[in-house]
């Protein structure tokens, strides 16, 4: 005879088993997707590497929007420009948050990294601050930094052309440290540079690990003690290293502001805003540190992609050089030439389409239930923008893996302008919606100046195999597989276009040297930079 208590336990067990059986299943009103397995859903089908290839295949199979069931979570993948614009841009209030990221945000970042922060009050405050310190007016004031570092990069290419990837990393990092903290990074071997990128690389290894993913898909795993989860232990250690580095940079800028040696930079602006908004030193340090990591890696990666593209498609460089020679002659291009160099401008846009860096974008999250194309998108769903699929849609971009700037010759808009209009977007390399990169103004200027000056000064040719004497064709499919995707190291033969241009590069750097001290830092505030008369921050 079954007692009442036994009956209750039996019902509870049946209910628990029923709920467990639902994990991994795709509800009928969700967007379509690949077949699932109980508990796992589609977890077993997510590749460890080159995920963009599989995600593009699913896009061709399932259409503009599909869903992946990942344990207890659901991911909605957007595969067309229309889908991204409709949901992430037009319905931005719903899709401005981020999914849970226990290791990346809660553990490594102590909840302070803006990139992964939920769209709560802190994120909204920081977004407003970022607009004030990274807007188009402010972007124009940093042109002296961009001018200096592109000239230094030309000298580096002239002296050690085989190390061109290192030169672009140093350029990108130095530009970012100047704009963020007010100091130049004069060598890629700077210990501050090395520590920052060591932390970034080690963090990504943890964030991309299967264990980290499982703790997001099955949150109960987070309660496992640290001694049984090495990922958690290492993440906490990385947080201590990271916050120490970021605070050191921030407090050093504060000290320089107090003694009158600081240069205009984001952190000086932050100190003024910190007095107005009363946010913590740790948050301020993470804002600066996050800008450092993001800006340093992305610009360099895009430039590496451009060099690979013109090595594979040399006719592009020839056309661009003819345009530059006609407009600029024997002088270096500058930002005043933007309206007169439409093909070079198109090269910048095509680079961002051809090698966007974040091939699957950065994930957003829905904050309430929504409906699109008749499918339900549930609250807290992860929203993934399949940038690779959009950028390689043959209906919009015929022969998409051909690097062809002519696609953009009739695009008169800057990326920022196109992102805010009803016209076709140039690309989604800077993201979309309310999470779009707010450094877009600075990035597009850095890329134009770098690309135009490199093309003015140098020819980029395929390297020759010393044994076979045949040209080496870089593989456009040989990509790094980290947080930010770029071509893996490849050889190229980089030579000055003429002795006169090589001499001019040296002369331009000689003029810059007069502005630098013995440590190769700015002697005074560069001419043209707006210095706000901030009182020293205690």
UniProtKB/Swiss-Prot annotation:
Root EC class: oxidoreductase
Function: The PKS fogA releases the carboxylic acid (8E,10E,12E)-3,5,7-trihydroxytetradeca-8,10,12-trienoic acid as its product, as well as derivatives with one and two double bonds.
Keyword Repeat annotated: no
Superkingdom: Eukaryota
Loss of function: phenotype: Leads to the accumulation of the 2-alkyl salicyl alcohols.
TM segment ranges: 4-24
Protein name stated in the entry: Cytochrome P450 monooxygenase fogE
UniProt cross-references to InterPro entries, sorted A to Z: Cyt_P450, Cyt_P450_E_grp-I, Cyt_P450_sf, Cytochrome_P450_fung
Single annotated GO MF: oxidoreductase activity, acting on paired donors, with incorporation or reduction of molecular oxygen
Membrane topology: Single-pass membrane protein
Residues that bind heme: 437
Cofactor(s) the protein requires to work: heme
Keyword terms of this UniProt record: Heme, Iron, Membrane, Metal-binding, Monooxygenase, Oxidoreductase, Transmembrane, Transmembrane helix
